Amino acid sequence: MQCVETNNLKQLLEQVKPYTKKGKLATYIPELGNANPDDLGIAIYHKETEYVHAGSSQMLFTLQSISKVITLALALLDRGEEYVFSKVGMEPTGDPFNSIIKLETTSPSKPLNPMINAGALAITSMLKGANNEEKIERILNFVREITDNPTIHYSAKVATSELETAYLNRSLCYYMKQNGIIDNDIEELMDLYTRQCAIEVNCIDLARIGLIFAMDGYDPYKQKQIIPKHITKICKTFMVTCGMYNESGEFAIRVGIPAKSGVAGGIFGCVKGEMGIGIFGPALDENGNSIAGFKILELLSAQEGWSIF
């Protein structure tokens, strides 16, 4: 499969740029409300020809919910499938990503999947480490290895902004603690989770994450298996069924690749055995996905025949 050319990417960005006017920033996290809604960037990392990029592709933004894929992989490495899925389910939910409804109405009471906030918080609570500093360093080092970027760090400003306003996430934690899903100190867990979500990347970093998952955990440039194949399979399956919030079904039909979005405007996707895609567009649709990012992936998938279906 040929890699998309830079000029083609530039043309596609111009084509979808008007969609940014239809979206809104994630202002409920104060720091994210400072983004420029007109920013739009993309990078594609191919297994053989490195990467092409266009637009705001080197601008830093925070992973937010994209980090859920990273911590799921780490938790599976740390604890194994049996333990992880005794605490968190495998099913999609039709509710918003920060909803408490299914925790109250499902028996046994456990988060339906690792891509909603309740599930992601439970996953983060499973990570091994003596304290939060050790745990966040493990997460950062994992991201650094996948991206081949040793400078990756988190934004303390964004993490603090999230920590100060994360009332609903705290309530999810207390409810799960009541039901034996987590046993961590809630404020310590919230501190780690907000730092995890505030890890900063650009489109090129994100595309390289996509490439590693596209290659079943293998880094074709380092010629090294970074993540076990069976773990990437689990992660990619959740990306298909739950990765794009309440738009996951429509995304599967219109784009048809494993992908995960975050409310800072990032989306990463993977084309099996070929390439990873990283997108940044902070103007979001009503489901919390980059509105222009969704559209450019739809156009690229139709043009290049990416859909797995």
Curated annotation (Swiss-Prot):
One of its GO terms (biological process) is glutamate biosynthetic process. One of its GO terms (molecular function) is glutaminase activity. It catalyses: L-glutamine + H2O = L-glutamate + NH4(+). This is Glutaminase. NCBIfam families: Gln_ase. Pfam families: Glutaminase. It comes from the Bacteria. HAMAP family: Glutaminase. Keywords: Hydrolase. Its EC number is 3.5.1.2. Homotetramer.
